[in-house]
Amino acid sequence: MDLGIPEFTCDVSLEDGKKPQPLQFSFTLYDLDGHGKITKDDIAGIVSTIYESIGKSVVVPHYGSKTINVRLTVSPDGKTKQTASAVKKAAITPRRRYRPRKLISDDDGSDTSENCPRVMRTRANTVVANTTINNNVKHKDNNVAKDEDVVDGLTKSSEAVETTFHNNLNGKGKTLNVKNDNIYESINNLKCCNIQAAQASKPTVALSQSPGTLNNSTATTVICRDCSLEGCTIDETLPLGTVVIPATTPAAAISSRAKRKVVRKSRSSRKASKLTDDFSRPRARSLSVGNENCYENMIGTTQEECWKSSLCRRELIEIIRDSMVKNSLCFQPNRKPLENSPKHRHRSHTIAARIGAEHCGETVMATQQALVAAHETNLCGYDSYLHQTICAAANANHAALHLNGGVVGNGGVFTALPLTTSTPNRLLQHHSHHAHAKAKRKEHRLAVATRSQVHHQVAQPVKLSTAVLNQQYPNLSAEQKLSRSINQVEKWLDNRSPKLVNKLKLAEEIAEKSPRVAAAKLKRSKSKEEITHKSTKFENVLTTDLLLDNLKITEDIAELSVVTPKKIFNKECLISSATKKNIRTHHTTKTVSTTTAVVPPAVDKASKNLIQLQYASVPINAELSECENLIRISDAEEELHQSVQQQQGTHQQQQQPQSSVSSPTHHHHHHAGASLLGENSGSSASAASTTAVHRYVHEHIHHHYHHFENDPDES
């Protein structure tokens, strides 16, 4: 039984929590199609009209929204009983990022905001004449099914209702006098509802909601068919304005949908019920590590829980810094050595036994101690990473100063440390390293020039060249030679220097006793025996020691003149150590027999010493690695060599004219150099050659070496 009602009057009351006077709206709906139903287009027109009137003053938070709850009371004109009703309900959506929202611009229900989430589902029930509620059950069921279909296609643009900020709107009927008008308070009451237990004979009445119940709630007024009026009977003479939704007999078809809606709305209401009215503040972009949805404008328990689950950036930095300090961790970039990693010394940066007058140890140490003290005050700030990166080398220098300070106090060796701190900039380290090496070379040149002007024998600084180190450790491999510790070298210097001083004093006494003759200019000598006068065994030993010391000076100059790369040098060391035994096997009496003494008889011991000093001050452009085979001998082998020379002195003088006549001059030079190479490589060391021999070997080294290996017995 359909009732043809052409007009409906809808009165809407909007209440704002901050405004005492509610907004009153009155709508008249016309049933133009003759179906007697309120459609979604009608509801959309009502909602859009309400929003256009209040929407301009609403500030919408970007993460959520409020819901307008509008209750429509529709009654025919002149009727005193409730004849028709319509309920519009709006649900809150989950939180989303801010999107600009499109509004409904027309009243005919056209959907113009497709990008907005669907917020409100409106269900319009059948307008029936409700004089007898249980009449026409079949007709009502059909209408309810149609209305459910209408709900699914309801306008998405009703999100405009969401955007009312503080306006939790409660529809008030003009004549609401119901006993239990606060039965339906919030969405939380629906948790106890058992929708599946709906009974067809038990209708449900949605009553008016008090103004304060939804003031801070985003829950919508969802109609519960089962528990809203339990124990209450329906008054047949309900006053006009009461919303009545008749129950349906086949409730199982609707219960599943309603249950899903209830769960969805209750979940959103729990989240939104914790929000306060302070939504007008803009969101501060959080730098926390924790929850992405942690907003600064959330206060109370919600904000406390959110901040408990996240870490502020400042707190995170503090935790990381404390952990690094506790574990002594520091980020080391690639190819950068650690503090306690073994440091390899450069070959050319060796240690002198005595500190010259140019060095001022106390000044250097005082400057470095002041530098270390400045770093110990942690001038680089609170950051532990910067402190460990910049100030680590200063602490290492401080420890090295304590070590070297004790050695200097005992008269030992002092190594001048560079005054630059270790910074992450490798260019600074590289520059300071080479500047320090250049200054050291310049000081050494000045010292050599000063020694060359002095005509009496003085104690020379002992150069720790590779030959001297090989003399102490002849069986070490090339890698072991690279990692010799400085302590072993200093210990060797302390044991070595007193012996040399005693020998030099004896040499000075012998030189003073012998008659002084004007120094004659010698020819270019080819061997050590042309300078050494074989008078007694004691003099030969002293002269050999002097040659050893002067040869070390020559090595200093050779190192300053030619800088040998480390890889080439190691290769040459390996070659020389590998071929040393073969050269020794070839070195027998024939090698010694080719060398002669052609010293003019007028030259005495003092003049020979003077000439040696002059030769020693001349720079030699020869690679140290090539001449290393000439300077490898021990003191015991040297004394044995001198005794062999005395025994075969007469035999050498007899064989020399024959060899010189039988061979051309250039060929004789080759054999003399080759025999000398074999002698000083197999049985010699850092003590067996003069500066002239270095010159000669530099000119013919490769030819002599291969010639000697091919025909070692040729004389």
Curated annotation (Swiss-Prot):
This is Protein naked cuticle homolog. It is found in: Cell membrane; Cytoplasm; Nucleus. InterPro entries: EF-hand-dom_pair, EF_hand_dom, Nkd-like. PROSITE patterns: EF_HAND_2. It comes from Aedes aegypti (Yellowfever mosquito). GO terms for biological process: negative regulation of canonical Wnt signaling pathway; neuroblast fate specification; Wnt signaling pathway. Cell autonomous antagonist of the canonical Wnt signaling pathway. May activate a second Wnt signaling pathway that controls planar cell polarity. Required for neuroblast specification. Residues 642-664, 673-690 have a biased composition (Low complexity). The lineage of its organism: Eukaryota, Metazoa, Ecdysozoa, Arthropoda, Hexapoda. Residues 18-53 form the EF-hand domain.
